[in-house]
Amino acid sequence: MTDNVLKLSRKNIKKLIPYQSARRIGGEHGNILLNANESPVSIFFKLKKKPFNRYPECQPSKLISSYAHYVNLSCNQILATRGADEGIELLIKAFCEPGKDAIIYCPPTYDMYRINATIAGVEIKEIPTIKNTWQLDLLNIKLNLSRVKLIYICNPNNPTGNIFFKKDLIFLLNITLGQALVVIDEAYIEFSPEESMTNYLKDYPNLVVLRTLSKAFALAGIRCGFTLAKKEIIQTLSKVISPYPISIPVSDIAIRSLEKDYVQLMKNRVLDSNNNRIWLINQLKNITCVETVFESNANYVLVKFSMFEKVFETLWNKGIILRNQNEKMNLKKCIRISMGTRSESLRLIKELKIFSKKNMCQGEMSEK
């Protein structure tokens, strides 16, 4: 009977491997979680007493106006969503015809662009970034624009941590004008705010920017994000969003987080994270089992290790949970490390030094 039920599912879903989120693949036993690019510290809000027997506004007006003020845009340019992930999905729903249109995504990058397109039955054109520099392969993107409706760019890119050249993003916007939307996922932009593309929304009707409160705002648990675009795009997305995407508690917490004092606290946390990243990178460069530390503009660092599997497993068993990137395109032997507190980073470095000393003494460090 179960087999008969499973036959009812769509063919592409039967073959689909779901997104392997940090919580989905385990590691909850760990006491140092450096695998999901979350804030290592939490902020707390006292919820207002409100009745919950009525549905919320589809787009809570106070939330929209608060975020509009934060990003210096008009309210009609903003759609509140369940994390930036919902924005990724809505764009495909609203703009791509299954079996006809395509998206471009540029691995190694965030997998949800590809997964959402697969679920929707939309073709995926994979244009890898240039190896080692991780910059966009503009020539191949230009040659593959046929039938493309959406181009997803994560900036800063996850998991590599690099920023894409602004001139390349502008070039992309120009060559796709009237043909495709360029979607810049700025989930980590608060860590490099000068690189944001929001100022270009007034110049390019084909630009869409995705944002979230999950990272710098330390609110991954409430799932609140935003899509920023021309009002016509926002109106189109509003046709396909669920009736009540933002719950009353989520809206209340998000509004509080966007108040002046809390925004300043967020900026202070970002400064601490960026300083900790600089410190961690310098420390990692002196660890024997580390081959390469890639520069980063976000709250994580990509590191290439010798004996990477043994490094990952050893730290895992000690309760330090990192993110294995070995299966990602061009990221062999790489592990992504989220920024933790300074004490967590000190513990990580201590364990890596112990590991290196032990394995160097055993003559195993030459294994590549």
From Swiss-Prot:
Which parts of the sequence carry N6-(pyridoxal phosphate)lysine?
K215
Needed cofactors: pyridoxal 5'-phosphate
Question: What GO terms are given for molecular function?
Answer: histidinol-phosphate transaminase activity; pyridoxal phosphate binding
Q: What is its EC number?
A: 2.6.1.9
Pathway it works in: Amino-acid biosynthesis; L-histidine biosynthesis; L-histidine from 5-phospho-alpha-D-ribose 1-diphosphate: step 7/9
Q: Keywords, A to Z? A: Amino-acid biosynthesis, Aminotransferase, Histidine biosynthesis, Pyridoxal phosphate, Transferase
Q: How does it assemble?
A: Homodimer.
For this entry, the protein name equals Histidinol-phosphate aminotransferase
What species does this protein belong to? Buchnera aphidicola subsp. Acyrthosiphon pisum (strain Tuc7)
